[in-house]
A protein has these predicted regions:
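Juxtamembrane low-complexity tails/linkers enriched in Ser/Thr-Pro and polybasic
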Residues: 1-2
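A structural signal for multi-pass alpha-helical bundles of membrane permease subunits
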Residues: 5-307
């Protein structure tokens, strides 16, 4: 009996070993190493030395860009994720109503999502150029204000949000699948009871697709917490520094309005060679992502139980 239990235990560990190895190498070890180096003075070249909480004090109190980067990241999480979910659901509902040409419209709305982030951001920056871009030209022709977009601190984050909405095809596809899976009988019964479109959406559509909405929000929050490529490329294109990598570039252009936490990690770790402080920001970013995910799953599961 003991031998059989031991064999079963060995067999279980053997089957789990690929996952355990992957989890240890790609998650547990990097996480613990990041936490370890957040308490060390380390530039990537010399031996690390223990500094206690000095790195944390520097990032939270003396590093001039941390709080601005945190505010920008939270702004993007709240605004960008919310609008992407709303637009993705709205477009999904519109496309599912189309009687003919469904495949064509689905492809048209999904294709922008497949565009490489760097190329898409560069194209958007040129389109929204306040001096030569066609968008401001059209706005001027019809008598509307012409924003500075990526050159204006007040408009840079809304411009990044517009870029994210342009590539909302991924959410459209998953919402379409969820909407098409809602039982038609429920809609027919609601119509017979005299329920209008708003009532059908609130009491039939939304409860049925709530798991997909929760999935879209959670994954959107995690992805936006790691927002890096579009913000830095947009800043470089708008500042005119994209063509020459040797030119001095103002991080977070314009005036720090596009700083995000991942950019701070890059700035500290690879431009200032302050690996310890970069690890502090990485630990904070991980903690925020975990806290936001746990909160959303807890609140979301409450909505699911209620439905």
């Amino acid at each position: 009996m003991v031998v059989r239990k031991r064999r079963n235990a060995v067999r279980t560990v053997a089957f789990l070993s690929p996952w355990l190895i992957g989890f240890t190498v790609f998650f547990a070890y990097p996480l613990l190493s990041t936490l370890y180096f957040s308490f060390m003075r380390y530039d990537g070249f010399t031996a690390p030395s223990f500094t206690g909480l000095k790195n944390w004090d520097y990032v939270l109190d003396k590093y001039p860009f941390f709080w601005q980067g945190l505010r920008n990241t939270l702004w993007l999480v709240l605004v960008m994720v919310s609008l992407r979910v709303v637009f993705g659901l709205g477009i999904g509902m519109l496309v599912t109503k189309i009687k003919s040409g469904l495949g064509f419209f689905r492809t048209v709305f999904y294709l922008p999502y497949l565009a490489p982030p760097v190329a898409a951001t560069m194209a958007f920056a040129f389109l929204l150029n306040p001096g030569t871009g066609p968008v401001n030209h059209v706005l001027g022709e019809i008598g509307l204000p012409q924003p500075g977009w990526f050159n204006d601190p007040a408009w840079s984050k809304p411009a990044l949000t517009m870029l994210a909405l342009w590539g909302v095809g991924d959410l459209m596809v998953i919402f379409m699948a969820a909407l098409l899976d809602v039982p038609r009988e429920q809609y027919e019964a609601a119509r017979l009871d005299g329920a209008g479109a708003p009532q059908r959406f609130r009491y039939i559509t939304l409860p049925n697709i709530m798991p997909i909405v929760l999935f879209a929000v959670v994954t959107g929050v995690i992805q936006t917490m790691q927002y890096y490529t579009q913000a830095i490329v947009a800043g470089k294109v708008a500042s005119g520094k994209i063509a020459n990598a040797g030119e001095q570039f103002e991080p977070g252009y314009p005036h720090g309005s596009t700083w995000t936490l991942p950019q701070l990690i890059y700035n500290l770790g690879f431009q200032r060679f302050d690996t310890g402080s970069a690890c502090v920001v990485a630990v904070i970013l991980f903690a925020l992502s975990m806290a936001a995910t746990a909160l959303l799953l807890r609140r979301g599961s409450g909505f699911l139980r209620e439905d």
